[in-house]
């Protein structure tokens, strides 16, 4: 703006001095343009100032409205927080009266099952929660009095106030947090229910309560003999005092008058007990199946050697509760494949062995003895195949006799076989023919003894039809082998007789 005014002043001074008409016209046009430009600039600045003032006024109004809204929201939050605090105080007052009381609290197991157990209320949480129905509630901290699993077992150091770990790092329980609405009445143990086959929980030395069944009860000495469930207990039958037992509640049918109805009631109670045990077994089976789905599957399945047997090992393991795809042990976490033995090179350091393994692309089974045995087995198999091919190409006296005696075909084939037989037998010396004759005679005597034993077995086992059939086929094959040996002996004797005749003719 100032520059434009300075230029306009210079143009007016030039007009006063200039006398040339053409220059004056140009200066007058330039002055008109500058005056128009100054007028437009002044009008735009005035509009900008007005818009700025209007915008500032609008921003102030918006800021005032936001400030008022924030004040109202703060007042509402303060009111809500006061209401929540009042509700929390009411719930804390209500549940603080239950501190130290016994109750029945829910516990969710790792496989998803939910069950109620007796517990002791030891604290109230400071935070409000919303239950399933949208009602405000607080959580209570409870310690289970009859823990059946490791995660339910209370920490002794926590009870004494000396535990060095927090709730997430400690292996034992510092108290489970359960909603106050989920708390139920305490189930007091009723020892009058103790009877034979009654399901109970028994406390062992690991402070866990294990399931079992009552064998006998002594109410005078308040002792009970219990058979514990599961295979992990070495002594399944033990004596427990009543203080270390907790009878499980079993729904019973109404009492009936007749004896037959009482018998039906007993059967119904046993069925309920069995259904209870079936539920536990079903939960264990579900956990094992879940474990098999999320467990790394090895390349070799358990019992792979049974492809050569009838699978009796797998049948026995299945009858004992083993689930295919899981590991060994009661919890299904044991190894399936044996630990591979490693044989390191003799006289080499561990660093040198590691360098060898790294040179083999980090193969973990580089020094495995199983791999070496399989490699040696493949080499031996290849050597056996080569030896078999080599032996099959060789033609000895027995192979020649078998081919000549058992071979069948046209007359031309027989003539060629006879010619080959004569030629091959003539190639052998008298000594080799005598040796083969002795061997064949021994085989004939041995085969005759086998035939005699088979005939005795047939006579002794005349009742068993399957054995008779198998022995008959065996006897028939032995007779065929005997006939083959006798034919070979006849051929050898003919060759020897021919040579003797020729010798006599030459001597004559």
Curated annotation (Swiss-Prot):
<dbReference type="Pfam" id="PF01585">
    <property type="entry name" value="G-patch"/>
</dbReference>
<keyword id="KW-0479">Metal-binding</keyword>
<feature type="zinc finger region" description="C3H1-type">
    <location>
        <begin position="154"/>
        <end position="177"/>
    </location>
</feature>
<dbReference type="GO" id="GO:0001227">
    <property type="term" value="F:DNA-binding transcription repressor activity, RNA polymerase II-specific"/>
</dbReference>
<dbReference type="InterPro" id="IPR000467">
    <property type="entry name" value="G_patch_dom"/>
</dbReference>
<keyword id="KW-0804">Transcription</keyword>
<keyword id="KW-0862">Zinc</keyword>
<keyword id="KW-0539">Nucleus</keyword>
<protein>
    <recommendedName>
        <fullName>Zinc finger CCCH-type with G patch domain-containing protein</fullName>
    </recommendedName>
</protein>
<feature type="domain" description="G-patch">
    <location>
        <begin position="309"/>
        <end position="355"/>
    </location>
</feature>
<keyword id="KW-0805">Transcription regulation</keyword>
<comment type="function">
    <text>Transcription repressor.</text>
</comment>
<dbReference type="GO" id="GO:0005634">
    <property type="term" value="C:nucleus"/>
</dbReference>
<dbReference type="InterPro" id="IPR000571">
    <property type="entry name" value="Znf_CCCH"/>
</dbReference>
<dbReference type="GO" id="GO:0008270">
    <property type="term" value="F:zinc ion binding"/>
</dbReference>
<feature type="region of interest" description="Disordered">
    <location>
        <begin position="253"/>
        <end position="279"/>
    </location>
</feature>
<feature type="compositionally biased region" description="Polar residues">
    <location>
        <begin position="486"/>
        <end position="495"/>
    </location>
</feature>
<feature type="compositionally biased region" description="Basic residues">
    <location>
        <begin position="499"/>
        <end position="508"/>
    </location>
</feature>
<keyword id="KW-0678">Repressor</keyword>
<keyword id="KW-0238">DNA-binding</keyword>
<keyword id="KW-0863">Zinc-finger</keyword>
<feature type="region of interest" description="Disordered">
    <location>
        <begin position="486"/>
        <end position="508"/>
    </location>
</feature>
<dbReference type="GO" id="GO:0000978">
    <property type="term" value="F:RNA polymerase II cis-regulatory region sequence-specific DNA binding"/>
</dbReference>
């Amino acid at each position: 703006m100032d520059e434009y005014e300075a230029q306009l002043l210079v143009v007016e001074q030039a007009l006063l001095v200039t006398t040339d008409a053409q220059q004056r016209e140009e200066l007058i046009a330039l002055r008109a343009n500058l005056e128009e430009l100054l007028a437009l600039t002044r009008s735009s600045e005035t509009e900008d100032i007005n818009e700025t003032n209007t915008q500032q006024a609008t921003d102030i109004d918006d800021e005032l409205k936001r400030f008022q809204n924030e004040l109202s929201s703060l007042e509402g939050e303060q009111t809500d927080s006061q209401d929540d605090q009042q509700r929390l105080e009411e719930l804390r007052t209500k549940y603080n009266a239950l501190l130290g009381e016994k109750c029945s609290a829910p516990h969710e197991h790792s496989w998803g099952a939910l069950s109620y157990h007796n517990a002791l209320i030891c604290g109230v949480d400071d935070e409000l929660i919303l239950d399933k129905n949208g009602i405000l509630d607080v959580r209570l901290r409870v310690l289970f009095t009859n823990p059946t699993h490791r995660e339910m077992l209370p920490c002794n150091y926590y009870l004494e106030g000396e535990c060095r770990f927090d709730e997430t790092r400690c292996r034992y329980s510092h108290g489970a947090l359960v909603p106050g609405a989920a708390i139920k009445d305490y189930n007091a143990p009723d020892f009058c229910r103790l009877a034979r086959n009654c399901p109970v929980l028994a406390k062992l030395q690991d402070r866990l309560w294990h399931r079992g069944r009552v064998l006998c009860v002594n109410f005078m000495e308040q002792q009970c003999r219990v058979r514990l469930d599961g295979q992990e207990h070495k002594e399944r039958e033990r004596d427990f005092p009543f203080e270390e037992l907790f009878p499980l509640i079993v729904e019973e049918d109404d009492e009936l008058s007749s004896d037959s109805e009482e018998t039906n009631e007993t059967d119904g109670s046993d069925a309920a007990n069995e259904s209870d045990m079936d539920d536990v077994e079903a939960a264990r089976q579900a956990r094992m199946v879940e474990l098999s789905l999320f467990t790394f599957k090895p390349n070799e399945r358990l019992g792979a050697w049974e492809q050569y047997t009838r699978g009796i090992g797998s049948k026995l393991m299945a009858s004992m509760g083993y689930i295919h795809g899981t590991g060994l042990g009661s919890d299904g976490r044991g190894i399936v494949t044996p630990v591979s033995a490693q044989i390191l090179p003799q006289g080499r350091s561990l660093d040198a062995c590691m360098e060898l393994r790294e040179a083999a692309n980090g193969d973990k089974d580089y020094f495995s003895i199983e791999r070496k045995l399989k490699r040696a087995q493949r080499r031996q198999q290849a050597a056996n195949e080569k030896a078999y091919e080599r032996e099959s190409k060789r033609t000895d006296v027995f192979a020649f006799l078998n081919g000549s005696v058992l071979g069948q075909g046209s007359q031309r084939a027989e003539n060629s076989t006879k010619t080959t037989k004569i030629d091959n037998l003539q190639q052998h010396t008298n000594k080799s023919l005598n040796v083969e004759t002795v061997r064949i005679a021994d085989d004939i005597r041995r085969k005759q003894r086998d035939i005699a034993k088979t005939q005795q077995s047939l006579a002794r086992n005349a009742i068993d039809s399957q054995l008779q059939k198998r022995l008959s086929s065996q006897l028939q094959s032995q007779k065929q082998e005997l006939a083959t040996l006798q034919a070979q002996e006849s051929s050898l004797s003919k060759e020897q007789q021919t040579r003797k005749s020729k010798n006599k003719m030459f001597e004559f």
